Amino acid sequence: MRKKNDLEIIYEDDWLIVVDKPSGLLCMSTGKSNEDTAYSRVYDYAGKIFIVHRLDRDTSGLLVFAKDLETKLALQENWEEAVLERRYSAVLEGKIDDDEGWIETWLYENPKSLMVHCYGLREGDSPQKPPRKDWQFAATRCRTIKRGEIAGKPYTIVEFDLETGRKNQIRVHSQWIGHPIAGDRKYGAQTNPFGRLALHAQGLSFIHPWTGRTMKFRSKTPQKFKI
């Protein structure tokens, strides 16, 4: 592993670069040419580069870049088929009694507020079909890792595996089950014990677009995520 501009490079070959993005760093610029982003740091290291997928600013963890347009398109156009695993670790508010679970809902992003809204899996709802045609199906597997307390308040460490990759999916699904991610005030959190969003992209596995190899990457969960 190497560090360039404080961005840890997990893997690099002739086509791909996989980095470990810190929390608080945008993936790409919002329009400011001199804005510090994961993209600008990788560009300074490798030159022309293409981002394959994104993480929220406050989410840390594994992020994939392509070194050429063909590789980017090869991955993006077949992303759902190529990806074998997308695993996240999070600290949720409250005590979750279940050891594992499965969340299926429909998600919709409000174009004005940019908030993602959830529908399904409550009494009276019909998750088999969306309330409107512009809602997207989202499915998440979850597994309880540890239950504990911080300053007398209950928290639960949970691993999430994405079956679909919707915007803010884990954040919205956590709010939906009544246990927002610690530090996620946008989606209902009341506490911020770590001074950041307690969400980390810790595992990623996909089929390499050119070699056909199964690529598996892991990022250590931040040490501060302790309860």
What are these regions (language model features)?
Residues 1-227:
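RNA pseudouridine synthases
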